[in-house]
Amino acid sequence: MIISHFYDWQKLPDSMTEDLMAEFNWHGAKYLTINGHQLAEHVDDASGYLRNFGAHMRAQHLETRDAHAPAGDSWDLNIVDPDQRRKIFKVHSMFLEMLADMGVHTYTMHVGTRDYMPPHCSELPPLRRLAEEMLELLLPVAEKNQIILAVENSFEAPNAPDEVVGLVERFKSPWLRCCFDAGHACRMADFEGRDLSLYRPGYIEESWHGHIILEKDAYAKMKPFTVTAHLHDNNGYSDQHKLAFDGCIDWHKLLSELRDTPSLFSIQNEMAHSKHHIPVGRACEAFAAIEDFFATGVLNTKTDHEHRFQTVISTLLKNGEN
């Protein structure tokens, strides 16, 4: 199982990149995810930037197998503007070719929500068709470069699990699959005690045209098609991107389902380091526990520090008894 880590590499000066990569390596990480902000900020010099970033990774004995496409108003599958659509097809194609040379196997993409929300307020059917048309163009490029396009669930109507799965089912291509985002699914989960008033004011009207659809089990819908998963946590109402185990997700239940997914290629730590200021070591410990769970079926989220502390205390108590 590939365990890969996001980081806001675009916020670091190049001179510090390898220093931080060394931290990931020291704490047992083997893979890093190329994030969409990195790509979006280096469209004009992507080849040189990615070549340099890859050299930094190799120097610290790290690799990449997963990338996230740039996302948002100018990048998503269903954007309406014809000129921008032509542009992003060319740029996504360029990225796929370059990322293939780095060993990337999955390229996560957002369906998109800009033109569904005010002031545009497009309806779902035409946006769905636009997403299909973009995928029709990109899938031959993905196949040529042996990279799977992984469409991701989010928390707006165009990105709901049914929409994401619908795209995959319509194409029936091995080069189009799902990226399951655990934090996004948690935000849309129909859990006991859900209080719609705790969402951001205006969220339901803007992102769902007033008719929100909560999910009893989003992963059950996406499981047959899932090749990668973005793991992060939250309070159930905001996309906080906390570290796994720091929010309200039932991780034992979710990880058990992921462990039982034959098509799963990788899981990715999408915690927002620069937002929550979580040390690299702590993030790596959390995902080492997840990796152990995949191997053993036993989930132990205590950190190495806690284990060492308990070992010292146990030894002292034992010596005291003697």
Language-model-detected regions and their locations in the chain:
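N-terminal pre-domain/capping segments
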Residues: 1-104, 136, 173, 177, ...
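C-terminal/domain-terminus segments
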Residues: 240-265, 282-284
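Active-site acidic/histidine proton-transfer and metal-coordination neighborhood
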Residues: 19, 56-59, 77-180, 187
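Acidic-and-aromatic substrate-binding clefts and catalytic sites of carbohydrate-active enzymes
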Residues: 7-17, 35-50, 75-78, 114-120, ...
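Acidic/histidine-rich catalytic cores of soluble enzymes
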Residues: 32, 135-248
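Short acidic/histidine-rich active-site segments
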Residues: 231-232, 265-274
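Short beta-strand segments at enzyme active-site cores
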Residues: 34, 64-69, 104-112, 149-151, ...
